[in-house]
């Protein structure tokens, strides 16, 4: 099992967490005490949306996001597994629309 360094750029500053490749980014962020937005925890809404700044795109169920949003780098942290070290801007739900 691999683990990756995920930098979360929140309104309160940058936080670096280590996320195993078989755990959701949101779940590990919560375990580390970070307060990130979420609602459904199933990839069926956009409350937890983030935007990939750098690094490989996480492996996720992107069924809620449309092709343009995916191309723009948006992800849903509640259903995203890291595939490498990456930087993600959090709190991006409003930017989706």
Curated annotation (Swiss-Prot):
Keyword Repeat (UniProt): no
PROSITE patterns the UniProt entry points to: 2FE2S_FER_1, 2FE2S_FER_2
Keywords: 2Fe-2S, Electron transport, Iron, Iron-sulfur, Metal-binding, Transport
CDD domains: fer2 (cd00207)
Chain sites annotated for binding [2Fe-2S] cluster: 40, 45, 48, 78
Cofactor note: Binds 1 [2Fe-2S] cluster.
Boundaries of every 2Fe-2S ferredoxin-type domain copy: 4-94
Family membership noted in the UniProt record: Belongs to the 2Fe2S plant-type ferredoxin family.
A GO MF term: electron transfer activity
Protein name (database record): Ferredoxin-1
Essential cofactor(s): [2Fe-2S] cluster
Any one GO BP annotation for this protein: electron transport chain
């Amino acid at each position: 099992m691999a683990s990756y360094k995920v930098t979360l750029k929140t309104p309160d500053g940058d936080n670096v967490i280590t996320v195993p490749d078989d755990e959701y980014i949101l779940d590990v962020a919560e375990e580390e005490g970070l307060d990130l937005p979420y609602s459904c925890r199933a990839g069926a809404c956009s409350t937890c949306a983030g935007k990939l700044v750098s690094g490989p795109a996480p492996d996720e169920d992107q069924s809620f996001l449309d092709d343009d949003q995916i191309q723009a780098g948006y992800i849903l942290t509640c259903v995203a597994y890291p595939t490498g070290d990456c930087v993600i801007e959090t709190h991006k739900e409003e930017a989706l629309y």
